[in-house]
From Swiss-Prot:
Keyword Glycosyltransferase: no
NCBIfam families per the UniProt record, alphabetical: hemA (TIGR01035)
Residues reported in the UniProt entry to bind NADP(+): 190-195
Protein's name according to its UniProt entry: Glutamyl-tRNA reductase
Source species of the chain: Desulfotalea psychrophila (strain LSv54 / DSM 12343)
GO aspect biological process, one term: protoporphyrinogen IX biosynthetic process from glutamate
């Protein structure tokens, strides 16, 4: 009987506030995190996904181990009180874990249902895990299946038609506060994927002045040129606050980028013209105390959920269709997985029958001197056909729907191995 199982553990925007998520975000990169995961948990196969809205760990391991406790220690690493960890962490095993992964890949569990970023994030995480040898046959199959599920959902539903990214939700929030953005000056802090998406949406909304601040000036210039904007280094950031109206920050820094104490005197220079900050980074880039300054408005990634709700109703119908696809593909994967339990017995039964046929043919054919080669081949085909028909019922018995479930599979495997005297490990 299979003693290994698929487990999925995680925290996301639904279970855990950003103040906690930023403490456990793997800002040092996948290589460091995956190496730690292998050292501290040590599973047969493992995979880790870390985004602004979720951290999820997928493992294939011995089902008798207390994997949840081990993963919890790895994930929270003493940064969160132990009694709170249980409230934040979700733990799934077997089929529910598979269905959750497919749901995430299909963007049905995203803050913005239907957004396209999550699939790319899943694939990036997989490339790192695969390159480090963390994944194996089971997780490779499962993760590739999740990619195909996401593609099928995109193809067969309009889930992405009215979807917006987190970056676009930030732009929508800016419009809500300022109205027309044509005359507004915007500064992007960070030049990564989120910043680029924000720039695309801002230009689409009529913004004509974009400033990009980044630690790597070359990347800032590259992004600014793409949108007809201006690039600056991070040291010029505070000086630019005197002129801009909207700041969208999405760096990968592990510390606060813009401090409240530094902005206070700038507001006097601005004569208290409104300054709007949107922090879509995890860990957060912007000092939470900015909200205490007069005419300064700060929104973090969790606040964006209110903007996201505007488009939610238009996606509900397509989300139902997408959910049906996820359920169907989950069942298909389960059928394949259940088949792994009976496959060794199927092979053993066929090998035993083939061995019997070969043995009997070797004994019988030499005695039939009068038979020509054609007749001998006919006898061999006839015996093979009889064998195939004889095996049909027991093999069907093993693979039938009534065999689903590991306990039922194992009971039928044990029965057939006993009846046919099949030996060896399964």
């Amino acid at each position: 009987m299979f003693e290994k199982q698929v487990f999925l553990f995680g925290v996301n925007h639904k279970t855990t506030p950003v103040a906690v998520r930023e403490k456990i975000a793997f800002t040092d990169g996948y290589e460091t995190a995956l190496t730690r995961l292998q050292e501290e948990v040590g599973c047969d196969e493992s995979y880790l996904l870390s985004t602004c809205n979720r951290v999820e760990i997928l493992v294939y391991a011995d089902s008798t181990r207390d994997i949840e406790a081990e993963v919890s220690r790895f994930l929270f690493a003493g940064k969160v009180p132990e009694e709170d960890c249980r409230d934040y962490l979700y733990a799934l095993k077997g089929l529910p874990a598979v269905q959750h992964l497919f749901t995430v890949a299909a963007s049905l569990d995203s803050m913005v249902v239907g957004e396209a970023q999550i699939l790319g994030q899943l694939k990036t995480a997989y490339r790192h895990a695969s390159a480090l040898g963390c994944t194996g046959p089971l997780l490779n199959r499962l993760l590739h299946k999740s990619f195909s599920v996401a593609k099928r959902v995109r193809t067969e539903t309009a889930i992405g038609a009215s979807a917006v990214s987190i970056s676009y939700a930030a732009v929508q929030l800016a419009r809500k506060i300022f109205g027309n953005l044509d005359t507004k000056k915007v500064m992007l802090v960070g030049a990564g994927e989120m910043a680029e998406l924000a720039a695309e949406h801002l230009v689409g909304q009529g913004v004509s002045s974009v400033v990009v601040a980044n630690r790597t000036l070359t990347r800032a210039v590259e992004l600014a040129d793409k949108f007809g904007g201006t690039a600056i280094c991070m040291e010029e950031l505070y000086a630019q606050l005197e002129d801009v109206d909207i700041i969208i920050s999405s760096t990968g820094a592990q510390h606060i980028i813009i401090e409240s104490a530094e902005v206070r005197p700038i507001m006097r220079v601005r004569r208290n013209r409104p300054l709007f900050f949107i922090d879509i980074a995890v860990p957060r880039d912007l000092d939470p105390e900015l909200n205490e300054l007069e005419n300064v408005y700060l929104y973090d990634i969790d606040d964006l959920s209110n903007v996201v709700e505007v488009n939610k109703s238009g996606r509900d119908h397509e989300a139902i269709k997408a959910g049906c696809i996820v359920e169907e593909e989950t069942r298909k994967f389960d059928e394949w997985y259940q088949g792994l339990a009976v496959k060794p017995t199927v092979l053993a039964l066929r090998e035993k029958m083939s061995g019997i046929i070969e043995q009997e043919l070797r004994k019988t054919l030499p005695r039939l001197h009068d038979l020509g080669e054609h007749d001998q081949r006919s006898i061999e085909k006839m015996v093979a056909s009889i064998s195939s028909k004889f095996l049909h019922d027991p093999l069907h018995y093993l693979k039938s729907d009534s065999c689903h479930g590991r306990d039922k599979s194992q009971a039928k495997v044990d029965t057939l191995r006993s009846v046919f005297s099949l030996k060896g490990d399964i």
